[in-house]
Amino acid sequence: MKKACMLALCSMLLPHAYETARQRLIGWPQQEVEEGLIPEGLILKKQGLETAVDADAMMVGETSGTASTQPDNSSTRVIRTGRQASNAEGPGREYEPVMSMGIPIIGYLGGSKLTLLANQTNTQMLSVLVETNQGHMIMIDGGTEGDSAHLVESLLARGGHVDTWLITHPHSDHVGALMDILKHPEYGITIGNIYYSFAYPSWYQENEAYRADLVLDLLAAFQTLPAQTLHGDIFKGQEIMVDNVKITVMNQPYLYTHNAINNSSVVYLLEMNGKKAIFLGDMGEEAGKQLIADNPPEKLKCDIVQMAHHGQDGVGFEVYRILQPEICLWGAPSWLWNNDSGSGMGSGNWKTIETRKWMAQLGVPYHLCIKDGDQIIQ
């Protein structure tokens, strides 16, 4: 009776947040719970009410604060619960076993805003929109051609002008939407600056010939822009200022012959209002080792990390250990998140589950994933 009353109380006070949590918890496979991939508790905060959701018992109970029935989206955020990392390989610092569950993280970026745009097709992709304190837009990659309509809609809703567009590497799931925008000026999107660093076209032909044409198509699309818009000569250590946001180029492309284009990803570090976000593109294990060899740990440490290669078969554990992020951005659709090739969780050959276990070892509290829709940090 007591449990039923508490459940009813919280469902009235937090209808949207509670229902979202309830549905997501019900959807978690028991295998994930047993393997320690699911947080022991989900904590939501709404106008002073703290609600703990137990993943096993599905019991919701008020833990502190004063309840209010008035909706206030501005006060909704993920809060910390506190727990010690259990694996000796991790940094051993306090962490909160919380997944944001698609709830916006509010009051984190001090007036700036980061949106991880959701995939509009069933493929992996990366599209991140950063807004400065003054409202100017910075784009990282942009996703596939199939993601273009949602991206255009998002940009037009904010005025349609992108001050700075950063490209990590020329793969279609990262630059397909940008190419579509460049080919269709009638969309109404304007771009002030595009930053990138590519190898010679012959290098792509030699190492990933089946993707070489895409690079040529992208370079051809660039020719529709004024020359002063294109910055294809960026270098390690270069700093780009957009209002209050400082962008640092962390590497020249590493030209490995194995996993060639992924390993050639340019890494960008964005600093805004005391927080750091690092974008790894599709960087692989070899380039990841080179990245940490070329940069001291204090320069790489960040608050937010975009998971390399959509969270699987990217950089190694040691890179994430040095980064020590608090928030992970996952460009993974549901099938990739669950390593599901069609026969259930864990049936595929991808390494997402392994990477998720790494993050649990490191005590990373917050995980935002494109499978859950547009994800917001502000």
Q: Language-model segments: which ranges?
A:
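Classical Sec-dependent N-terminal signal peptides that target proteins to the secretory pathway
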Residues: 3-19
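Long, low-complexity repeat tracts used as extracellular stalks/passenger repeats
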Residues: 34-35, 42-61
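Core dinuclear metal-dependent hydrolase active-site scaffold
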Residues: 58, 65, 71-160, 230-299, ...
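Binuclear metal-ion centers of metallo-dependent hydrolases, dominated by the metallo-beta-lactamase
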Residues: 90-92, 97, 193-195, 199-262, ...
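Active-site-proximal beta-strand/loop segments in catalytic clefts of secreted hydrolases
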Residues: 119-120, 140-143, 167-171, 197-199, ...
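Active-site environment of divalent metal-dependent phosphoester hydrolases
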Residues: 123-124, 145-147, 170-176, 201-204, ...
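Active-site metal-binding motif and surrounding structural segment of the metallo-beta-lactamase
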Residues: 135-136, 145-196, 295-312, 324-329
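Metal-dependent catalytic neighborhoods of phosphoester/phosphodiester hydrolases
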Residues: 175-185, 205-213, 317-320
